[in-house]
A protein has these predicted regions:
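ABC ATP-binding cassette signature C-motif
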Residues: 2-262
């Protein structure tokens, strides 16, 4: 990656719905993301976290302003849905369809079968149709297909959804040594604090704010119901902070984790 990875320049996005009417998700937001940045994204319900990831990958265009990609960017986006998988394919066919061999973050060359085994797909599972896999297994396969493509920027939208305890540990360990740029949306506090270096919040008023105090600052902001984060492009007040869903609470308990409803 060069010095320029992802840049938002005066980006504005407005959405409308019958329930909430017209709302501005982003109001002239300017933000630069560099090589090796590891960012956790949190925010109020409906603030636009998924929309922001879609702006980054180009599937959503801003109403005004510009989203710029670095010249050497290879971006992969893990969405909350698993409908990008072909249910008629077998597990091995699905991975080979991306690439037969790949290079790991450690520099070691690995085959599709090697990685599948590392992700818990062995024996009969290799020839199992995707449509016959559990939701957690499909999520695991979706992650593996992204990593096989050797991206240097990862966008992860609720990556811990449906993952079993072993896959959670494997994903955390992999991302710990992954050298690229990482942007994660998650309600799993442990996961964010393990794999991300900084936290940014979508405040629900069209602004994106850096939280130097991390998730603890967000929790304090939620308790006080008054603005406290540092300014990015523009930071205003917000009257209601999201109450995140628990998500995989049993798994957190199994690992003696501190999963908070923040």
């Amino acid at each position: 990656l060069g010095k320029d990875v992802l840049d938002l320049n005066e980006v504005t996005v407005t959405v409308s719905s019958d329930e909430l009417g017209e709302r501005t998700l982003f109001d002239k937001v300017t933000w630069s993301i560099g090589p090796g940045d590891r960012i956790g994204l949190i925010g109020v319900n409906g603030a636009g976290k998924t929309t922001l990831l879609n702006l980054f990958d180009g599937s959503r265009k801003p109403d005004s302003g510009r989203v710029k990609h670095g010249k050497t960017l290879r971006l992969a986006h893990l969405r909350q849905e698993v409908d990008d998988l072909d249910s008629a394919m077998t597990v091995l066919e699905s991975v080979n369809d991306v690439k037969a061999r790949t290079k790991l973050a450690t520099g070691r060359d690995a085959s599709a079968t090697d990685l599948l085994e590392g992700f818990g797909f062995t024996g009969q599972k290799l020839v199992t149709r995707i449509g016959d896999l559990s939701g957690g297994e499909q999520r695991r396969l979706q992650l593996l297909r992204l990593l096989m493509d050797e991206p240097n920027v990862l966008l992860l939208d609720e990556p811990t959804n449906d993952l079993d305890i072993d896959t959670l540990r494997l994903l955390e360990d992999y991302l710990d040594s992954w050298p690229g740029t990482l942007i994660v949306v998650s309600h799993d506090r442990w996961f964010l604090e393990r794999v991300c270096d900084v936290v940014w919040a979508l405040m629900g008023d069209g602004t994106v704010a850096f939280l130097p105090g991390g998730i603890s600052q967000y929790l304090e902001h939620r308790r006080n119901r008054k603005p406290s984060p540092s300014k990015s492009s523009r930071v205003g007040s917000t009257s209601q902070v999201a109450e995140p869903k628990m998500g995989a609470a049993e798994l957190r308990q199994a690992r003696s984790r501190n999963h908070l409803s923040w």
